[in-house]
């Protein structure tokens, strides 16, 4: 499809009157954006359907979170993201490294986009994402807290349903993938409205 669009652009751009050039280019831009959305949907669906069982190894949870914070900071450095470890040392537990990288990238990026959406209506809002690590008995708790738009009173089951999305350009698979990763690691996840934003709470076995 993309190749066909490029050919149409090359063939007809110089044959269209100057009055119609703007509309022609704008329509091609819209089609290109729709192609990209379809491509993203296909890729995410493929990843979701083919996600393998986790390869469990001892990994440093703090390191994974910090690496993904650094990645998200490159998208929007105006949003302050920090890791708050309430334990005396780094957390080393069994998890699939590749899947957890995807998990935290998706969650932090989701928070970032929520804040960006809120900032479009109010540029004076606090732009913060706090990621807390706590321990409760035999479990590790990770809270991702942001100052975004919240979950608009949606229930967890609705949020993790494939293809459900509140975003104009969302595929509706991001949180479904997150939920599957957590479930495959024998953990649980909750999506909560929190003060002036949202809170995602992950509970994982401490082993």
PLM segments and residue spans:
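Conserved catalytic submotifs in the C-terminal HATPase_c
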Residues: 80-92
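Conserved glycine-rich
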Residues: 187-188
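Short conserved segment of the HATPase_c
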Residues: 151-162
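A conserved beta-strand-to-alpha-helix junction within the catalytic ATP-binding
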Residues: 25, 55-69, 130-133
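Detector for a conserved hydrophobic position within an alpha-helical segment of the HATPase_c
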Residues: 182-183
């Amino acid at each position: 499809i993309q190749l066909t669009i490029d050919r149409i652009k090359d063939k007809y751009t110089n044959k269209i009157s100057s009055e119609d050039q703007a509309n022609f280019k704008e329509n091609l831009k819209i089609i290109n954006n729709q192609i990209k959305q379809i491509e993203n949907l296909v890729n995410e669906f493929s990843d979701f359907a083919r996600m393998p069982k986790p390869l469990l190894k001892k990994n440093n949870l703090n390191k994974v979170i910090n690496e993904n914070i650094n990645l998200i900071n490159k998208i929007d450095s105006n949003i302050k993201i920090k890791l708050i470890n309430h334990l005396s040392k780094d957390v080393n537990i069994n998890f699939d490294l590749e899947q957890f990288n995807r998990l935290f990238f998706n969650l932090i990026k989701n928070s970032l986009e929520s804040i960006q959406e809120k900032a479009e209506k109010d540029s004076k809002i606090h732009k913060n994402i706090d990621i807390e690590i706590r321990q409760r008995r035999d479990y590790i708790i990770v809270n991702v807290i942001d100052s975004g738009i919240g979950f608009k009173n949606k229930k967890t089951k609705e949020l993790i349903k494939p293809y459900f999305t509140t975003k104009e350009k969302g595929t509706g698979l991001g949180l479904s993938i997150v939920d599957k990763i957590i479930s495959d690691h024998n953990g649980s996840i909750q999506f909560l409205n929190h003060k002036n934003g949202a809170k995602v709470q992950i509970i994982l076995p401490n082993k």
